[in-house]
Amino acid sequence: MKSRFAPSPTGCLHIGGARTALFAWVWAKKQHGKFVLRIEDTDLERSNQASVDAILQGMNWLGLDYDEGPFYQTDRFNRYKQVVRQLLDEKKAYYCECSKERLQILHEDLIKQGKKVRYDGCCRDKNLNDGVVRFNNPEDGLVIFNDVIKGQISINNKELDDLIIVRSDGTPTYNLTVVVDDHDMQIDCVIRGDDHINNTPKQINLYQALGWHLPEFAHLPMILSSDGARLSKRHDAVSIMTYRDAGFLPEALLNYLARLGWSYGDQEIFSMDEIVKLFELKSINKAPASFNQDKLLWLNQKIIKNSSVENLLNNLTWHLQNQAITITNAPNIEAVVQYLQNRCKTLVDMAGEVKMFYQDFDTFDEKLAKRYLKDKTPLKHLFAKLEALRIWKANNIKQAVKEVCFELNISFGKVGQPFRLALSGNGNAGSIDIVAELVGKNKALSRLKMAIDS
């Protein structure tokens, strides 16, 4: 059993495309089948290698590995010509010489008459030998198919056009190439966005004209943005790699994409194995799904919190390099990540907090310094107690802070806040006892002294 993902390389891998790829990938895994990647690059003017690279990068980051491909339609032009020749020889296609001007007049006349705009078959019986090639669509009968998601769909052939299958420059069009490719690649289930549903009856007629077995069709509901408009490449932050750059885990994005139109009870978080086990195409909603950035962020935070340190480190490395953060031998980076995973919503946040454990600073936040470093007495007392500690552990550090509070008869905050600022430079240090332990005694005392001397 095979499914496929067939993007056009005219831009990055975006949210809608990634969800289509995910559902096709999951379907293939569930069927113990194969997932095929095909690059539909017949639009020679708009297709480009940079977009191909972006699509492959996005799929690699998401972990959507393909079993076959990537196949490129531009490598298969001879095959398409062979099929077109067959259709021409069998009078199931014909050459058309109608000019753009004639077609424009026809278009305007049909609109004036309140009729559906479609080609009138002017060249159908002329037996021409040149021009664009049109498919000789049946004039009578119905095209009926059962969409796995949307149910039975019926279209009268009178509503369909004699579509162009070869352009004037000799390049094949989408509706021809997709039929030939899905047949040759033995695709059993065509999973794609519902913006393709109007093409399906045309493609079914092509299948039947060629005497080929029909695959199943499953058209996914559209994804709406927060303003209710259809999510598209023109909306901000829809590129998959934008989410990598913003610090989202790939499994968080995959989990969220799976829930855009599909659900299993009230369960919010799934492993990929669970998605494969529980997923059913027929369970996908027909109604559009809404993309909610806040929900994705919430999900990312949950998955960071429950992820393994090893997985977080694998994904964090890119962000550390991106922020020019060098990890030295001490403190142990695994221990730092284990502490931070309970605090951070994104890996960008985590990388920012990792910095204070490995990179020294020579200034303090000016506003916080005016507030917390006016009276150096608490820090001087704390420095003395911490310097005397023989065992540098969080519990002992916390106890030293409490002792200073007791001896000076001040609140915990009067010691804790200056200490937090001293450790981090910006006051964003979380649990000061744990941070101080991880930073290490020498570095913690050095930063305390700098705060006292400031």
UniProtKB/Swiss-Prot annotation:
InterPro entries: aa-tRNA-synth_I_cd-bd, aa-tRNA-synth_I_codon-bd_sub2, aa-tRNA-synth_I_CS, aa_tRNA-synth_I_cd-bd_sf, Glu-tRNA-ligase_bac/mito, Glu/Gln-tRNA-synth, Glu/Gln-tRNA-synth_Ib_cat-dom, GluQ/Sye
Motif ('HIGH' region): 7-17
GO molecular function terms attached to this record: ATP binding; glutamate-tRNA ligase activity; tRNA binding; zinc ion binding
Enzyme class, UniProt record, top EC level: ligase
GO biological process, alphabetically ordered: glutamyl-tRNA aminoacylation
UniProt KW keywords: Aminoacyl-tRNA synthetase, ATP-binding, Cytoplasm, Ligase, Metal-binding, Nucleotide-binding, Protein biosynthesis, Zinc
Residue sites binding Zn(2+) per the record: C96, C98, C123, D125
Domain of life: Bacteria
Subcellular location: Cytoplasm
The EC number(s) this enzyme carries: 6.1.1.17
Function recorded in the entry: Catalyzes the attachment of glutamate to tRNA(Glu) in a two-step reaction: glutamate is first activated by ATP to form Glu-AMP and then transferred to the acceptor end of tRNA(Glu).
NCBIfam families named among the record's database cross-references: gltX_bact
Family indicated by similarity: Belongs to the class-I aminoacyl-tRNA synthetase family. Glutamate--tRNA ligase type 1 subfamily.
Protein's UniProt name: Glutamate--tRNA ligase
Organism: Ruthia magnifica subsp. Calyptogena magnifica
